[in-house]
């Protein structure tokens, strides 16, 4: 039983900087905030009974408690009957959640699905492996959970940035090109904030005041304001000291945030008289050598277009690539021979931030905002993930 899959609501939290404005919130709390924001936009759906499933990405799950997706659902007010699945496909987790949700509806297993993701990189713990068996004698080691499970290649133990350097060498992408890309990403995101382009997608997060201080609301992405052009250009390379090109400034930062998307079947769309925002036209995934994860999106995008029945990539109005590093945006634009003016027009993860388990949904939320506000119809989102993979989704604005 194949049927169309519609997006009827999207929402995301602002993206907080590492140990920044959202540091007091767990990933589950951020996920629930995003989901509540999405639910508020579709009052026709009864949160307690109309939802069949939630599929939510989360990468750094240590110390969150069992089944983060289930926690998000119940915290946001969904019924106890809801089936919940947490996805860990590293950076592509939330996009995989969207794909799985669409497949569930297409197969007739569900009619209303929440897809998205959440991450608090700030609150990811350190690990002490020796504590389980007893450290016995002398010093022991603390392992950074963010680095171990989020930012290091599991196969060679190298930082993902080392492979970003490999990509720059392999594809002849210079430090100047990466710095220019990063500056442009910041400038586009700053301009988009100024013009209110993100207002419809962001749901404010309330931060409880302490010691008699009033509660505050976080309403904007925190990172874009941190641009200092001269500091960015003079930043030292991190992963390759001599003749390196990748810096902390032209890579995405470490962040906190969440995003949620509500998917429905055509039957529920008509039955509940819902207004469709977009249709999920297709998706595609690919993988190759783990060290080449940076350009895996260029393999996933053609698969997604084929699945969506789109033969000419030039007919796509806008693209959203997750900017894990500036080189990721540059290399995939280069390989696919895209018009750069169609790519990440509101800025990307270098400037907005990259909360790992959230980003795959965040790029789709922002892509839909772009299509709605810039007059486009067809959009493609893609995101690479550790291990050499990538996921891509094609949407059509309605």
Curated annotation (Swiss-Prot):
Pathway: Metabolic intermediate biosynthesis; (R)-mevalonate biosynthesis; (R)-mevalonate from acetyl-CoA: step 1/3
Domain of life: Eukaryota
Modified residues (N-acetylserine): 2
Binding residue positions for K(+): 186, 248-249, 251, 350
Compartment(s): Cytoplasm
Catalytic activity: 2 acetyl-CoA = acetoacetyl-CoA + CoA
Annotated catalytic residues: 91, 354, 384
Main EC class the enzyme belongs to: transferase
EC code(s) of this entry: 2.3.1.9
Residues annotated to bind CoA: 186, 231, 252
One GO MF term: acetyl-CoA C-acetyltransferase activity
Coiled-coil segments on the chain, per record: none
Role of this protein: Acetyl-CoA acetyltransferase; part of the first module of ergosterol biosynthesis pathway that includes the early steps of the pathway, conserved across all eukaryotes, and which results in the formation of mevalonate from acetyl-coenzyme A (acetyl-CoA). In this module, the acetyl-CoA acetyltransferase ERG10 catalyzes the formation of acetoacetyl-CoA. The hydroxymethylglutaryl-CoA synthase ERG13 then condenses acetyl-CoA with acetoacetyl-CoA to form HMG-CoA.
Family: Belongs to the thiolase-like superfamily. Thiolase family.
NCBIfam families: AcCoA-C-Actrans
Subunit structure as annotated in this protein's UniProt entry: Homotetramer.
The protein, known as: Acetyl-CoA acetyltransferase
Organism in which the protein naturally occurs: Saccharomyces pastorianus (strain ATCC 76670 / Carlsberg bottom yeast no.2 / CBS 1503 / CLIB 180 / NBRC 10610 / NRRL Y-1525)
